[in-house]
Swiss-Prot record:
Region of interest: Disordered: 484-508
Region (G3): 355-358
G5: annotated segments: 234-236
CP-type G domain location: 158-362
Gene name for this UniProt entry: LSG1-1
Organism taxonomic ancestry: Eukaryota, Viridiplantae, Streptophyta, Embryophyta, Tracheophyta
Protein name: GTPase LSG1-1
Naturally occurring in which organism (per UniProt): Arabidopsis thaliana (Mouse-ear cress)
Chain positions covered by the region annotation G1: 311-318
Gene Ontology CC entries for this record: cytosol
Length: 537
């Protein structure tokens, strides 16, 4: 009897032990499956993907006839309108609407949380807050006068940003020096102040070696007037100096023609930037302690100051981190979104760097192709290469394209404005002809040429830059002329002379008109045959 009771007790213990092991395996498997999915940036989703994602985030099934199942109509043609207004009037209306709804473009906020909150509750609150934020942006997309650029739609990516902002004393927003305001997110600075009023945000103006010194002076004046903390920096130049290798790219050579004594225009080196970051972060910590504010739970366990790096993809965050660390610690590539998780890197006993994945913040823009040309969206996923090349052709001077690629672009016709930029088709076909890019169909491989031109544009091989908003278009053209040199000025004078009404003969005018008709398919086949026979006679 006792033996049987002992046996049954042992079996019960073994059964309970096996049951606990099975539960542990199932929990581990579910955790592994949950984190097995690679963290990937998502900027565009289809209608069905959006419906499924909303259903998962809301943790309930959507009815078939739910309102959100109806695709939101988005008018991507910003130059047209059903009311028949001109393109200029449409642009003015769009700018007024953007100014009216500028405050609606916010970074998603992390809901309030406490260390005592369990994982399920925290996850549900974050999903609900993110879903509410997505719905607010969807309501903006319903406005036909607004064009919302693609933005990050993966909650896990935004979670990385939340962690970095909470851990960091100083937030460094890395921007491209050629157009700093395009990459700057003012609401991110406001969000950092909401988390902790003592946090500061610094603009790290990367790729500053691509700007002439007078352009850096203009931007330095603009940043100072608007109380923006900034530093000019070049990750590529710092890496080359660290490795003891000269810059191979001649277009990235330091600007020695125009020197200035303004210290604000100086392009910082590695040691100077580390000292500046440490100084700014220590001031924040001292100010926080002097006012009796306790440190957050993440930073109270150590005396290190934390500097977090945030910004758009492909602006040079990972390159900057590698240059500051002194060795390759984060992946660097021309494709946006290489960094998947935030990383903490210890520089010294009192300084820690925190790298955040690149985020595409929501913004208003006239075209998504500007984001492709800027490198924010991947070039390899580009579908309309002509529109993206059009952006490059309009921003880079004609002579600069010809000098860089050693090509000769077709000149404008006599009936066209002589100062017009080259067409995208002209640039692509000329480039394909000079490089021998031919597709399998026998036609010029314009897609391959477009990808190469866009990569050169992003890398800085094709020179371009934007001026501060206070600079008028005429002033920008005048300052740009100063950097082009004597050859450029001679070329521009030739173009200005060409703008005057030339004395054309009747035969030349007829030839131009016939070529225009042929290009637009306005000439019938009979006319072509008659013209050929007339020439033979």
């Amino acid at each position: 009897m006792g033996k049987n009771e002992k046996t049954s007790l042992g079996r019960a213990l073994v059964k309970h032990h096996n049951h606990m092991i099975q539960e542990t395996k199932e929990k581990g498997k579910s955790y592994k499956d949950q984190h097995k999915k690679v963290l990937e940036s998502v900027t565009e989703v289809s209608d069905i993907d959006a419906i499924i994602e909303q259903a998962e985030e809301a943790e309930r099934l959507f009815a078939i006839h739910h309102d959100s199942a109806t695709p939101v109509p988005i008018n991507m043609d910003t130059g047209s309108s059903s009311s028949g207004i001109t393109a200029k009037e449409w642009k003015e209306q769009r700018m007024r609407e953007e100014a009216l709804h500028a405050s609606s473009l916010q970074v998603p906020r992390r809901p309030h949380w406490t260390p005592k909150m369990n994982v399920e509750k925290l996850d549900a609150n974050e999903k609900q807050a993110f879903l509410t934020w997505r719905r607010k942006l969807a309501s903006l997309e319903e406005n036909e006068k607004l064009v919302l650029t693609p933005f990050e739609k993966n909650l896990d990516i935004w979670r990385q940003l939340w962690r970095v902002l909470e851990r960091s004393d100083l937030i460094v927003m890395v921007v491209d020096a050629r157009d700093p305001l395009f990459y700057r997110c003012p609401d991110l600075e406001a969000y950092a102040q909401e988390i902790d009023e003592h946090k500061k945000t610094m603009l790290l103006v990367n790729k500053a070696d691509l700007l002439p010194s007078y352009v850096r002076e203009k931007w330095a004046e603009y940043f100072s007037r608007n109380n923006i903390l900034f530093v000019f920096w070049s990750a590529k130049a710092a890496t080359a100096t660290l490795e003891g290798k000269p810059l191979k790219e001649q277009w990235r050579a330091p600007d020695t023609t125009q020197k200035t004594d303004n210290p604000a225009v100086k392009v910082y080196g590695r040691d100077d930037l580390l000292d500046r970051l440490k100084l700014e972060a220590l001031e924040i910590v001292k100010m926080r302690k002097s006012r009796g504010v306790s440190a957050t739970s993440t930073e109270s366990h150590c005396e290190q100051v934390v500097v977090g790096f945030v910004g758009y993809p492909n602006v040079g965050k990972s390159s900057t981190i590698n240059a500051l660390v002194g060795q390759k610690r984060t992946g660097v590539t021309s494709t946006p979104g290489k960094t998947k998780h935030f990383q903490t890197l210890i520089i010294s006993e009192d300084l820690m760097l925190c790298d955040c994945p690149g985020l595409v913040f929501p913004s208003f823009s006239s075209s998504r192709y500007e984001m492709v040309a800027s490198g924010v969206l991947p070039i390899d996923r580009m579908t309309e290469h002509l529109e993206a090349i059009k952006v490059v052709a309009e921003l880079v001077p004609r002579h600069a394209i010809e000098d860089v690629y050693n090509i000769s672009l077709p000149k404008p016709k006599s009936y066209e404005p002589q100062s017009r930029p080259p067409l995208a088709s002209e640039l692509l076909r000329t480039y394909c002809l000079s490089r021998g890019y031919v597709a399998s169909s026998g036609l010029p491989d314009e897609t391959r040429a477009a990808r190469q031109i866009l990569k050169d544009y992003i890398e800085g091989k094709l020179p371009h830059f934007a001026m501060p908003p206070e600079i008028t278009r005429d002033d920008e053209n005048e300052t740009a002329d100063d950097t082009l040199g004597a050859e450029t000025r001679e070329g521009s004078q030739t173009e200005k002379k060409g703008e005057e009404a030339p004395s054309l003969g009747l035969d030349q005018v007829l030839d131009d008109l016939s070529s225009f008709d042929l290009a637009n398919g306005l000439v019938s086949s009979k006319t072509k045959q008659h013209k050929k026979s007339h020439r033979k006679q």
